[in-house]
Amino acid sequence: MKIGLLVLRGDPVEGPSVVDLSSYIPPSRHQFETRYISKSEAEAGIDRICKDEFDMCLNYMTVESCDDVSTVAAITRYLEAKDITLLNSPCLTHITDAGEETRRFRIPIKAHELNLEDLRGKKWLTLAMDMGREAMSFSPGQFTSSMCLDQEDLHSTSTDFTWVTEDPLKSMLRSMALDVLKASSGGFVCVEASLQAQADSMYLEGLLCTPRAFYREKHSTYEDVVIEQEFPGGHLAFLDMLITSKQIRSGQDHARNQHLAGVYDSFAPRYHAARANTGLSRMQEDMSRDYDFSGTVLDLACGNGEFGATLHENGVSAKVTGIDVSEGMTRSSYIQDHYERPLLIGPMDELIMGMPEFDHVSVTAIHEDLSDAYIEDMKKRNGELCSNFNHISTLEEFGVPNGWQQVLMQRFPLYENPNLGETVYGFAIRFERA
């Protein structure tokens, strides 16, 4: 994708942006170009950006003064009116009783809920992001010396912070970040919070800050550290999730998903015979014997349910839940006999984020080493909406998440493609908790 990085500037020429996504994301995945928006000619600058035909944009317009709050809010509204797709919205404002536009908001707390004396003067940052149609928040960080980005109180880019591990403060901060994310419709947000008092009332005061993720000096900010440590796949997976979530929420993949479901509905009567005696069936047999799948299993792209049947036939005591885009594929005796109810029908990337925890997650037949000829043949046979990809570079870039170990990574012949007369290869991969 071609992604624009939008930075607000005063009229004088200033130095380069401190944000550098190309340090984290390979150019083979996405291309980034920085566009500076002048405060005095913002609308003209945005009109020029529209001609650059970016697929999406990241909004890094930093508020540096009280006047900038209204300026950035107005520019953001103009961006949205021009149908520029923004991956984040760092400017959530509301009007105070005094008629001022502000980014600050308050959450009342009761004195007995927190040890107030220990928390006075402290400041915390919490990152939150969209995950499909759901949302998640990261571990909050408490700074030893903190300043915030609006220069009323500038927070430093230093990683000199400690993790907030104790409740109820941790839960309060994460809940606040999720509330701000929901209100901003923002893709991802970073919220700075502090403890404040007014008369007899105590409250957490929150400030929506411009996220400092993807900084030029790698892992020099809270955001970059927490993404690297807590988000499997790191910054690349984080950005891809933001893009995917935006696409899901916009509904732009609806036609593709419906088309794909129809393709597999038509294939369903022939699937069992096509799968028999293939590398796929042998791989699933081997996996069910060689690794522990006991407990609860989430089977993504479960198809006709033969993996769940294979587990049970090999004596595995597992409750298997399935997700598949094709209702026709799931009308099988394997599903009836081996899968929990309800079975979920729909795109797995949309449904998975709302699922409870499972002991194991299985994803079948998506890690494929596909040739260009195969990809083009699938489009010719099933239409442009039936897209396929070679996933090898994605696997390599994903790596091994923190706290996990890769116990299996094996390339094997998946099946024979009769249309092209070639063998399609795939990868069997397994991660386990370290």
From Swiss-Prot:
SUPFAM superfamilies: S-adenosyl-L-methionine-dependent methyltransferases (SSF53335). GO terms for molecular function: methyltransferase activity. Disulfide bonds: none annotated. Its EC number is 2.1.1.-. Keywords: Methyltransferase, S-adenosyl-L-methionine, Transferase. GO terms for biological process: methylation. InterPro entries: Methyltransf_25, SAM-dependent_MTases_sf. Disruption phenotype: Has no significant effect on the synthesis of 2-oxocyclopiazonic acid, cyclopiazonic acid (CPA) and their biosynthetic intermediates. Pfam families: Methyltransf_25. It comes from the Eukaryota. Coiled coil: none annotated. Belongs to the methyltransferase superfamily. Putative methyltransferase; part of the gene cluster that mediates the biosynthesis of the fungal neurotoxin cyclopiazonic acid (CPA), a nanomolar inhibitor of Ca(2+)-ATPase with a unique pentacyclic indole tetramic acid scaffold. The hybrid two module polyketide synthase-nonribosomal peptide synthetase (PKS-NRPS) cpaS incorporates acetyl-CoA, malonyl-CoA, and tryptophan (Trp) and utilizes a C-terminal redox-incompetent reductase domain to make and release the tryptophan tetramic acid, cyclo-acetoacetyl-L-tryptophan (c-AATrp), as the first intermediate in the pathway. This is Putative methyltransferase cpaM. It comes from Aspergillus oryzae (Yellow koji mold).
